[in-house]
């Protein structure tokens, strides 16, 4: 039973009736993730997203270089497991002390990445260093570097380094991570890292390299496709 002074008493731990579950299976319905930013419904945001979709329909996906950052920790572990009926599935991970690092990376249509792992959060100085020393040397004339409008990304020095390579910079519409396929790359990278369970910064650095090595051109093309970049199919 679940009790509340405000809402009274209700039954708890009730299980969905089997006929309902069977009906969902019959209709081939499965659990989906549908959450998106409510701000996407704002008129100005919606207009910018519509313009971006027009851009998607005509841009050569081979030219796109997507950029983003993410956090990695030394307490990562698998979130779910399997065990025989009646037995627990147990695991362990640090709960009080762990290390956190940041990874800045790009991804292209062919699955290639240019990545930098470092301590602390992304700031203008670190972003400039990444662009100059890691990303810019790999750019080709006509490339388009796509990133979100994070304050650390607003660097004229970084833009100049990119334009020296005859490439250009484009910012994604606000509240639109669904237009950046690198978000899906992070999901795969972290899935691999949860399996490796690196517990020191040195181990995490090596494990991150291993995770990035699992990314294939097929992965990248699938991620671009799911985000609306389909010109490579024509």
Regions inferred by a protein language model and the residue ranges of each:
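Short functional hotspots at interaction and active-site rims
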Residues: 1-234
């Amino acid at each position: 039973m679940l009790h509340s002074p405000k809402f009274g008493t209700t039954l708890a731990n009730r299980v969905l009736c089997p006929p309902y579950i069977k009906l969902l299976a019959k209709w081939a319905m499965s659990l989906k993730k549908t959450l998106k930013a409510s701000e996407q419904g704002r008129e100005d945001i919606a207009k910018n997203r519509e313009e971006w979709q027009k851009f998607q329909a005509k841009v050569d996906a081979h030219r796109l270089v997507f950029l983003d950052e993410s956090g990695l920790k030394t307490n990562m572990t698998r979130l779910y497991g399997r065990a025989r009926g009646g037995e627990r599935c147990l695991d362990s991970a640090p709960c009080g002390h762990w290390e956190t690092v940041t990874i800045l990376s790009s991804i292209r249509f062919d699955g290639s990445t240019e990545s930098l792992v470092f301590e602390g959060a992304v700031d203008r100085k670190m972003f400039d260093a990444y662009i100059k020393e890691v990303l810019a040397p790999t750019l080709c004339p006509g490339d388009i570097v796509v990133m979100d409008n994070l304050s650390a990304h607003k660097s004229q020095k970084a833009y100049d380094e990119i334009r020296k390579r005859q490439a250009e910079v484009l910012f994604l519409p606000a509240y639109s991570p669904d237009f950046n396929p690198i978000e899906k790359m992070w999901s795969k990278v972290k899935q691999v890292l949860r399996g490796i369970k690196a517990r020191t910064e040195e181990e995490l650095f090596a494990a991150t390299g291993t995770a990035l090595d699992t990314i294939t051109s097929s992965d990248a093309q699938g991620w671009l496709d799911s985000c609306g970049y389909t010109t490579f199919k024509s």
